[in-house]
């Protein structure tokens, strides 16, 4: 009897706790609604640039909150071409480098190596050969890199990054990086003003919006 009573009370308390937790999130404080329609599948997309110091610093934070995302929430990266003094063509090359990394098993290592090349080694990517060198250093066959970088699938993904960039810039949602957008509909407001700074808090907010 006691066990049944406890189970009944728990069943009542859990929905109330979940509702209370969700009610803590406020539009305009913790997130902004930037579109009417949401993506068909739950996702969070980070708009970033390899040239952005803040994006580089965020990598460690992402590595902490990403594992805490619900299994149905996919984390995606999208490279932009409007950061710093680098010309758009060079930055677009880096978008294509990300797209190439996306189809390789060493993806995470490659992304980390590119950030490290720019922000730790203080080295430059002046031409495609520089990008290739980083990929080869991470175990990617040189010929395979050449084929993948020019492949239709990689060019298509890179083009989509550009389209997404322009779309969200027009919406007024993408003014700087890093910017996180959930389901193509909600822009996260991270920082002191919203109080969402810790990895656990970020993952909870993403999960809430992704399943909203």
Where are these regions (language model features)?
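Short acidic/polar alpha-helix capping motifs at helix-coil junctions
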Residues: 6-9, 25-31, 93-99, 128-133
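C-terminal cap of thioredoxin/glutaredoxin-like
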Residues: 49, 137-212
């Amino acid at each position: 009897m006691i066990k049944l009573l406890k189970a009944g009370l728990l069943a009542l308390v859990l929905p109330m706790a979940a509702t209370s937790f969700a009610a803590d999130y406020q539009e305009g404080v913790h997130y902004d609604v930037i579109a009417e329609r949401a993506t068909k599948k739950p996702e969070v997309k980070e708009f970033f640039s390899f040239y952005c110091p803040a994006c580089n610093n965020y990598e460690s934070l992402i590595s902490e909150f990403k594992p805490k995302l619900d299994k149905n929430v996919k984390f995606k990266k999208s490279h932009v071409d409007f950061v710093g003094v680098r010309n758009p063509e060079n930055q677009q090359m880096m978008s294509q480098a990300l797209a190439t990394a996306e189809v390789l098993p060493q993806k995470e290592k490659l992304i980390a190596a590119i950030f490290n090349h720019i922000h730790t080694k203080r080295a430059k990517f002046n031409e495609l050969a520089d990008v290739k060198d980083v990929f080869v250093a991470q175990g990617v066959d040189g010929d395979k890199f050449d084929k993948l970088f020019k492949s239709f699938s990689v060019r298509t993904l890179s083009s989509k990054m550009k389209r997404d960039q322009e779309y969200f810039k027009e919406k007024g949602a993408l003014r700087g990086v890093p910017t996180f957008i959930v389901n193509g509909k909600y822009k996260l407001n991270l920082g002191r003003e919203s109080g969402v700074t810790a990895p656990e808090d970020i993952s909870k907010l993403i999960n809430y919006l992704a399943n909203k």
